[in-house]
Amino acid sequence: MTEKILDATGLLCPLPVLKLRKHLKSMKIGDVVTVLADDPAAKIDIPHFCNETGQTLISQKATGSCATEYQVRKEI
């Protein structure tokens, strides 16, 4: 399993999800990506994207800054 970090801070909807989708294409099944995003819409968009595409949202937590950290495992 490989873990990668995708920094989407400063990007507004829908760019964090679009970056995540593009990044997932280059990952192997079982790999985990940590997405950092500070757009409030990402709190809804990233979990919804994972649910709709069959990926696993492992965790979603606020960081020390105003960003939120999302851990996503590629399943398909």
Enumerate the language-model features and the residues they cover.
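Intrinsic-disorder/low-complexity, polar/charged segments enriched in Ser/Thr/Lys/Arg/Asp/Glu/Gln
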Residues: 1-3, 30-34, 67-69
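An N-terminal amphipathic alpha-helical segment
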Residues: 1-27
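Residue-level detector of intrinsically disordered/flexible regions characterized by low predicted structural confidence
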Residues: 6, 21-24, 45, 63, ...
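Generic structural detector for well-ordered beta-strands
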Residues: 7, 36, 71-73
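Amphipathic, hydrophobic secondary-structure cores in small proteins
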Residues: 19-56
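C-terminal structural segments of small proteins and small subunits
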Residues: 47-76
